[in-house]
Structure formats: structure tokens, C-alpha cells
């Protein structure tokens, strides 16, 4: 019987995984310079964590979670997002006791949602995300956004834009929710069933509806920016000021509400408008979540973060036809002639690898011509040719595949020679 991967998943094969490692390294190195430290949380958590943290009324909790019972009847869920687990770890491990705040965390790993698979959307997908917990400072909001934009810039993307909104504090949102209910209620029957169910539970999510986005009431809906109280408006102005100071352009979209219940104040998305996508595509999204830490059992600690899809980042790179500097080939391939040379090459290739020189030998007993073809397929910069005569003389021939130049060197000096040539 032939087995196939489950629908909505993918195999990331050698070659493609090099691209993944490259962008993940950009993420890790950017986090290092911004002083964000990696956190690794379990793949599954107690279901209640996501119900409380993400929001009972969200599509994620109601429709998309992979939930199961273990052998003792406990309800567990494969993580659909990273923030709730990071905040749970922040609380459980008392990271709030650290004298230096905010606590800056990042994560990279698979998430799981039962969604309809389509281009760039999978049921197992990979996210990079950061969380800054313990500070309510507009400068932190700007820092988080700047970090995300820095990653896209380093990955070579040019067609990205930042879209920004403020969801205000609790009082601002209360006034705005009342205005939305008043606006939509008389004609709510014209909207989809999801919007109808959200009218009195979470009317902001109506603005996020894909089915009814062209409805005339969507276009005339009140703007949350008109309902921000003085404190919320001042906070948003400061965030915008810092972004301007950093030279990061942005657009304001008062209908940007994000799909999770925990957001307040700053909300943002980073989008690609590359022609290769055919439509504007969201690459990353995030915002401030003051109150979430307390909501899932911790002390009062404001926070902000974002998550970005690694699959969509790579798709954006392809859409812009950006070449990543991967698949550069190996440093050295050792061609052997004769059994004694082959036996010696096993220890020789080990020494090269231990010295940091990526190397390979023949494991298929190919003739010399076949070994040279393999060296070419692997993109070897140098080809070291070792026969039994050379071995007896403690010599080896080294060919530079770029220039065609070939020379004989002492075997014991091979590592030194290859390292010197690598620097040229």
C-alpha cells in the first residue's frame, strides 16, 4: 500500500529546506540584535488555554482547532497559534519576576488549523513570532513592527506595505461596539450566518468578514478612530510618530481588526502587493494584547507581538523572483582511484568536515568519470583526486572547478590549502 501525506500538509524536501533554513536564520539573527530570546513550548496544550486566550467566539476556537482527548479524558489541542502558549509559559515560569522588562521572546515552529487548503494556506503551517511582555510603551510597539519589517527587507522583499490601526482601550472599544451594533442590526439579516452570530458577541469581527466585504454597510460602517478616547488616541499618535522617526511608511485602515479576541490598541498587518501573487496577500499580523496575561492566570502585564507565516514569506520571495543565496554547492569532492585510496578517503573526508570544509566522497563505487559527474552535480568548488600512487607519496591533486587550475599538494596540508583558497 502506498501512503500519502494528509491533506493540507507538505513535505519540505532537501533543496527547498535550504531556503527555509536561510530565512529562519534571518529571523534568528534579527532577534539576536533586538535581544529577543527563543522559547519552545509544547506542540499541544490544554484546550481551555486557547478557548480563554484566543477567544471562545473566534473562528479558530469554534471551527479550526485539532482537539482530542488523551487516555485519561483530558481535552488537549494542537496549538493553532503561538501567543497563548508563550503567555502561559511567561506566567507559569514567573518570567514576570525578571528585573529587566519587557520579557522578549520569539518562537519558530508548526501550528495546526483545520482550514480549507489553498495556495499558501496549510493545515500544518509554520510560524515565526515574537512577544514583548511587560511594557506598555509605544516605543515597544514601534520596535516590534520594525523587527518584522527588517526581516522582510533582509529577505530581499521590496513590495511590502504596513497597514496600521488602533483598537483602543476597553472603554473605547465598548463605545465602538455599541455603534457597530446600532449600524448593522437593522439589516443584519442580509449578512452571512457568522456575521449574524457575531453581532452581539463580537461585532468588530463583522468588519473582518470575507463573504460580505462588499456590502454597502461595510463601506459606511463607523470608524473606530472616531471612538478612541483621549488616552488611546494619544497612544496611537505616539506609535505613528515613532514609525515616522524610523522611516517606516504605513497606511491607516480603520477596518483592520485582526481575527483574535485579545487585541487592543495597536493592530497591524504586513502585506505583499507583488504582482506574482495576483492579489494583496497578508504576510504577517499582530498587535497589542494588554489584559491577556491576567486573563490566563498571570499578573497585570501588558504585551505586544506578531506572527508571520514562513510559507507566505517564501511565496512572496518567489512572487518577486528574488534569488536566495542558497544551494551554493560543497567545498570539496574527493575522487578516489583504487581500494586503498577509497579506504583512506573515509578518514580524510572526516578530517575535512571537522575542519569546517563541506566535503563528500563516492559511496557507489563509481568509476572516475562518474565521480567527476557527481562532483559537478554537487557544485563542488574543489575536486581532490587521490590515487594509490599519490597516496604512497603522501600527495593529492586538487582541481579548482571554477578556474580549471590543478596542482599537487601534500596530503597533510590539504585542509590548510583549501581554507586559504576559500578566502580568495
UniProtKB/Swiss-Prot annotation:
PROSITE patterns: AA_TRNA_LIGASE_II (PS50862). It catalyses: tRNA(His) + L-histidine + ATP = L-histidyl-tRNA(His) + AMP + diphosphate + H(+). The keyword GTP-binding does not apply. It is an enzyme of class 6 (ligase). GO terms for biological process: histidyl-tRNA aminoacylation. It is found in: Cytoplasm. Transmembrane segments: none annotated. InterPro entries: aa-tRNA-synth_II, aa-tRNA-synth_II/BPL/LPL, Anticodon-bd, Anticodon-bd_dom_sf, His-tRNA-ligase, HisRS-like_core, HisRS/HisZ, HisRS_anticodon. The keyword Protein biosynthesis applies. One of its GO terms (cellular component) is cytoplasm. Gene3D superfamilies: Anticodon-binding domain (3.40.50.800), Bira Bifunctional Protein, Domain 2 (3.30.930.10). Its EC number is 6.1.1.21. GO terms for molecular function: ATP binding; catalytic activity, acting on a protein; histidine-tRNA ligase activity; transferase activity. Signal peptide: none annotated. Keywords: Aminoacyl-tRNA synthetase, ATP-binding, Cytoplasm, Ligase, Nucleotide-binding, Protein biosynthesis. Homodimer. Belongs to the class-II aminoacyl-tRNA synthetase family. This is Histidine--tRNA ligase. It comes from Bacillus velezensis (strain DSM 23117 / BGSC 10A6 / LMG 26770 / FZB42) (Bacillus amyloliquefaciens subsp. plantarum). The gene is hisS.
